[in-house]
């Protein structure tokens, strides 16, 4: 199963279109700096503003660039079950190693509806699916008991926990045990969740600090807890700055400041407020990502 630091990759744009050259360069940046897996077309990848064709093309491009060096876990979630099936089948056909599927948003299904949604998609494909539990975006939380039921479904292999609740993670790990891998969806809780038995992180912070995020997960997997705690504490000011506005506004801005890609966003996302930009820039300087 997937372990370590898996980056929730941004989607670089140039003049309104996907910047394919920068996308390939970002993949190489991660592979050179120890990232353990690439996750395109998630929340950080602005999947909500991608066309269906762009979504499929980005996943194919990332798979081609990675060339089997690390796993590619494609974002394939939708609030339409049939659309989630289509996206996941297409990702599997393209060679994705797994899929990350956000819980249905806006229509706010019941726990039974969430269960049936994932069951239908899992039965339609042969690649492992990581459930994405982020109630702040979806409007509904997947309860630990529901995840325990889902852990019995073939191909449901893990959950990205972005509830921000350590109690939630404890209950999921307690109820599911080895049947369901748990990944942190909060960069500030990587150490905490891995100390409880989590397998890694699907990370926004890794976009700009891939080496340090990978080192943190490696330390935890080796049970080098003092080292892991030290790295987590070092990352905290940067993590807070990266979430000073809606993700991925700050992280794309940070990558632009680093010269990795443009900071271009698609509406309804807009550039950072000047005061927040100054705070982000200072945090990046303090961490050593920028000079001066």
Positions of predicted regions on the chain:
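Active-site beta->alpha loop and helix N-cap motifs at the rims of alpha/beta catalytic domains
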Residues: 1-7, 11-141, 290
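C-terminal alpha-helical cap/extension of soluble enzyme domains
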Residues: 4-12, 29, 33-35, 195-198, ...
């Amino acid at each position: 199963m997937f372990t370590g630091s898996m980056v929730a990759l941004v989607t670089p744009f140039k003049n309104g279109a996907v910047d394919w050259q920068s996308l390939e360069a970002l993949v190489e940046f991660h592979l050179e700096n120890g990232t353990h897996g690439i996750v395109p077309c998630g929340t950080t990848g602005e999947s909500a503003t991608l066309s269906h064709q762009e979504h499929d093309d980005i996943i194919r491009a990332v798979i081609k660039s990675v060339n089997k060096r690390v796993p590619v876990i494609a974002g394939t979630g939708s609030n339409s079950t049939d659309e989630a099936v289509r996206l996941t089948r297409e990702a599997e056909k393209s060679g994705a190693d797994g899929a990350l599927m956000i819980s249905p948003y806006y229509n706010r299904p019941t726990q039974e509806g969430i269960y049936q949604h994932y069951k239908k998609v899992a039965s339609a494909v042969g690649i492992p699916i990581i459930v994405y539990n982020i109630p702040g975006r979806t409007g509904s939380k997947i309860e630990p008991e529901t995840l325990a039921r889902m852990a019995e479904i073939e191909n449901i292999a893990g959950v990205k926990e972005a509830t921000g609740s350590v109690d939630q993670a404890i209950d999921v790990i307690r109820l599911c045990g080895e049947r369901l891998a748990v990944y942190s969806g909060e960069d500030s809780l990587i150490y905490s969740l891995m100390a409880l038995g989590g397998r890694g992180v699907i990370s926004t912070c890794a976009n700009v600090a891939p080496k340090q995020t990978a080192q943190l997960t490696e330390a935890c997997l080796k049970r080098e807890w003092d080292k892991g705690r030290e790295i987590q504490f070092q990352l905290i000011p940067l993590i807070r700055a990266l979430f000073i506005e809606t993700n991925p506004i700050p992280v794309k801005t940070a990558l632009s400041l680093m010269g990795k890609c443009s900071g271009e966003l698609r509406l309804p996302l807009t550039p950072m407020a000047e005061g927040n930009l100054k705070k982000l820039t200072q945090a990046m300087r303090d961490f050593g990502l920028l000079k001066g």
